[in-house]
């Protein structure tokens, strides 16, 4: 396996009474959004390092300052930390692990009121697969590459190479 896109996610109920958030919101969110992608990384990264090539993209979230979604947000923040830490172990090699933030898109998870179509996020979401700058542990936000082709997004993300 050369490329892994950890894109599965679980968003728990929106809790207006967030001081009464049940523990299960956290445990379920962490199982799916943090622990599962970490285990997938732990499974595939050693083989990628052994071969000298690989790309892992972990899908994160830009949701911040919303205690109503604390379980979800905390689980994604933990995934960010794991990704950054794992990235430090392969920095400068042709094995790269990064985060991708698709933004708020009209999907089953994002709902019908989201401002962005899934198609508009594609260049920013898959960008990390095509980068070749040997930098790991960064967040690639789809909104930063909106309206670009994939080729334009790669050039914008690595201007010193072009």
PLM feature spans:
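Active-site loop of short-chain dehydrogenase/reductase
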Residues: 1, 48-60, 92-95
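Catalytic Tyr-X3-Lys loop
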Residues: 2, 10, 19-38, 53, ...
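Conserved NAD(P)H cofactor-binding loop of Rossmann-fold oxidoreductase domains
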Residues: 7-14
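Active-site helix of classical SDR
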Residues: 41, 75-78
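A short, exposed helix-loop element centered on a Lys and neighboring polar residues
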Residues: 41-42, 84
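Short, flexible catalytic-loop segment of classical short-chain dehydrogenase/reductase
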Residues: 65, 102-111
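Active-site-adjacent segment of SDR/Rossmann-fold oxidoreductases
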Residues: 66, 85-95
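C-terminal helical subdomain
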Residues: 99-100, 111-162
């Amino acid at each position: 396996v050369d490329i892994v896109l950890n894109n599965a996610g679980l968003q728990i109920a929106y809790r207006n009474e967030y001081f009464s958030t049940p523990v299960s919101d956290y445990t379920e969110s962490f199982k799916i959004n943090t622990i599962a992608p970490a285990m997938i990384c732990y499974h595939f990264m050693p083989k990628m390092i052994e071969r000298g090539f690989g790309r892992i993209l972990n899908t994160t979230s830009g949701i911040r300052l919303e205690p109503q979604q604390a379980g979800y947000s905390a689980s994604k923040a933990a995934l960010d930390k794991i990704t950054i830490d794992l990235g430090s172990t392969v920095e400068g090699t042709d094995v790269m692990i990064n985060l991708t933030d698709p933004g708020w898109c009209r999907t089953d998870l994002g709902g019908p009121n989201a401002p962005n179509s899934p198609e508009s996020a594609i260049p920013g979401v898959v960008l990390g697969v095509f980068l070749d700058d040997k930098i790991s542990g960064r967040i690639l936000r789809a909104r930063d590459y909106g309206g670009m082709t994939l080729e334009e997004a790669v050039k914008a993300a690595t201007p010193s190479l072009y």
